[in-house]
Amino acid sequence: MEIAIFDTSVWIDFSKGIKSSDTILLKKYLNENIPALYLTPTVIQEFLMGLRTENDFMTYKRYFETLNIFELDWKTVSISSAKLFFDLKKKVVTIKKSTDCLIAQIAIDNNTLLVHNDSDFDFIAQNSELRVYV
């Protein structure tokens, strides 16, 4: 299995018990190949912010603390993700959430597969070097 980032959208579906090719792949990574599963700070933040109970928050917080996270040069990734957003805007590609450009840029910089359930990433992949799971 190759190294992969699972976007917040997949973690949300997974936590709700939704069965899809993305959540099935996440479960496979969790069961068979945790070393290849990476998180980004944005995914952790977005997911934890959306939880409804303290118990769920603490459960996922403890779980996320055991997973890999990319070490980042925040200045460089911030500038390059802004450039990605800017370049997409010039191509008249509208990205609803600028944080998706940050997640995408981290995946691009690390040549990592991005697994998602968010149309923003499809638009980014069609207009950049982003590799997405289909």
Predicted regions and their residues:
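Acidic, PIN/NYN-like endoribonuclease modules and their adjacent C-terminal/linker elements
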Residues: 1-3, 104, 108-134
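Short, well-structured N-terminal submotif of metal-dependent ribonuclease cores
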Residues: 1-39, 49-62
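Short beta-strand scaffold positions
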Residues: 6, 39, 72, 115-116
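Generic structural signal for small/hydrophobic residues in well-ordered secondary structure
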Residues: 7-8, 47, 81, 107
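Conserved glycosyltransferase catalytic-site signature
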Residues: 8, 41, 97-101
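A generic structural signal for short hydrophobic patches within well-formed alpha-helices
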Residues: 11, 44-47, 121
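Active-site-proximal, substrate-binding regions of enzyme catalytic domains
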Residues: 55, 61-70, 74
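Active-site neighborhoods of divalent-metal-dependent phosphate/nucleic-acid chemistry enzymes
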Residues: 70-113
